[in-house]
């Protein structure tokens, strides 16, 4: 098959390179030699483009003083090391005397000519795009061919940042911490396994909401939560006023082992779902109406009376419902001791479930992750994107803060 005819630009470059190799007696033996030549070519092209940028900035070319219409001028060069796919190379960056010149070809704080592309790839990964989608996107928009391994290599740069974030120093006290787990599938030693991502969202005493931590483990267990809570304590957390959790067996005991004074609120919505999932369609509506009288009661005393009434009415058909509520009452009823504003904040884990739903949207194209690291990378990047919108605090936080200061006065004074 005949070689495709070169474009005029490529033909000129081919001739130039041929003359360069011949006149300098350059022998290309392996990839190392190719990289060396490419570095030289790239540095010449970049330096020429940078000089041209400064010409346009000043409005006159070098030595063309007759057309100079500015009090600014050239001021030599500074050297910069650029990391490229062909290895490190030194280039000369032109300077102006006033320091106004902001080069665009190689920006001031850019240390890699692929940095912008890497940022684009990381951003696409954060939006939940698969490696195949990213490859296609880069090919169509930028005419760049990249592989799965290249995407992984670029996004792997996030992992040290994630580790540093997981181990960062924390504040001594948090008003409320919501804790829950979300489940995914990942490959491990050639098998597809279920993974639990443990998530904690904090509300600071000033009312700001943020993600306290995310950790990948095996199926959700109180033992793993215990290790996370110990880690939080080692990072500086001395007290959590109220912890809002699901109904995982052993979870309250794990919290009490690390933060013995923490008030524990078990999620009412989780409890409703877990105890009514086997109720018949015909009876679910009246049963839920009776159950609402329990959790929506104005006081704990009224709630207990309504629970007894519910037990009498429904335990013939559904004996486990009232029993479960009574067995877990100590942690289900915590919110009754607080005023309405605090109750609304803590009686469900909707805060963290909303966050989990947003993570699901990002990861919906991934049925199985290649590894635990790839799962953590995507969730961390998605978290950064999601929490950008978390600004300010709740409108009623002033009222909530005042109430918490009264209820937890002694504990807060000790911190």
Enumerate the language-model features and the residues they cover.
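Subset of Sec-pathway N-terminal targeting signals
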Residues: 1-29, 33-76, 81-86
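Acidic/histidine-rich catalytic cores and adjacent linkers
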Residues: 3, 260, 293-415
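Electropositive nucleic-acid engagement tracts
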Residues: 61-70, 129-176
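Basic, short loop/linker segments at the boundary and entry of helix-turn-helix/winged-helix-like folds
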Residues: 69-127, 143-156
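RNase H-like nuclease fold core
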Residues: 94-97, 105-109, 144, 157-245, ...
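Metal-dependent DNA phosphodiester-chemistry modules and their immediately adjacent helices/loops
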Residues: 102, 275-303, 309
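Conserved beta-strand -> loop -> alpha-helix junction used to position metal-binding or nucleic-acid-contacting
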Residues: 242-249, 254-290
């Amino acid at each position: 098959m005949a070689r495709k005819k070169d474009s005029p630009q490529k033909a000129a470059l081919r001739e130039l390179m041929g003359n360069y190799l011949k006149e300098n007696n350059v022998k290309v033996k392996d990839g190392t030699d190719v990289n060396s030549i490419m570095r030289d070519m790239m540095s010449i092209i970049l330096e020429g483009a940078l000089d041209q940028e400064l010409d346009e900035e000043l409005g006159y070319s070098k030595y063309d003083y007759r057309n100079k219409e500015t009090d600014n001028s050239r001021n030599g060069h500074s050297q910069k090391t650029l990391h490229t796919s062909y290895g490190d190379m030194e280039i000369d960056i032109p300077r102006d005397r006033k320091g106004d010149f902001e080069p665009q070809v190689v920006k001031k704080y850019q240390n890699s000519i692929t940095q912008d592309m890497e940022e684009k790839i990381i951003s696409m990964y954060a939006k939940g795009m698969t490696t195949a989608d990213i490859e296609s996107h880069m090919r169509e928009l930028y005419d760049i061919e990249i592989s799965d391994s290249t995407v992984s290599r670029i996004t792997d740069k996030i992992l040290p940042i994630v580790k540093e974030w997981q181990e960062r120093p924390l504040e001594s006290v948090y008003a409320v911490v919501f804790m829950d787990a979300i489940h995914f599938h990942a490959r491990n030693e050639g098998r597809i396994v279920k993974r639990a991502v443990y998530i904690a969202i904090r509300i600071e005493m000033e009312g700001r909401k943020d993600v306290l931590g995310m950790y990948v483990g095996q199926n959700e267990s109180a033992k793993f939560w215990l290790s996370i809570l110990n880690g939080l304590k080692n990072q500086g957390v001395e007290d959590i006023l109220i912890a809002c959790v699901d109904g995982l067996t052993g979870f309250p005991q794990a919290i009490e082992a690390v933060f013995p004074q923490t008030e524990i609120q078990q999620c009412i919505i989780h409890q409703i779902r877990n105890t009514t999932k086997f109720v018949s369609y015909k009876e679910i509506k009246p049963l839920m109406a009776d159950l609402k009288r329990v959790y929506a009661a104005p006081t704990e005393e009224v709630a207990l009376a309504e629970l007894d009434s519910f037990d009498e009415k429904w335990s013939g058909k559904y004996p486990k419902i009232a029993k479960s509520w009574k067995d877990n009452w100590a942690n289900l009823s915590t919110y009754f001791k607080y005023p309405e504003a605090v109750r609304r904040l803590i009686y469900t884990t909707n805060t963290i479930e909303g966050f989990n739903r947003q993570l699901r949207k990002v990861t919906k194209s991934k049925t199985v992750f290649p590894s635990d690291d790839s799962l953590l990378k995507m969730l961390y990047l998605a978290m950064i994107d999601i929490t950008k919108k978390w600004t300010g605090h709740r409108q009623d936080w002033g009222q909530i803060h005042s109430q918490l200061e009264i209820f937890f006065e002694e504990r807060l004074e000790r911190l």
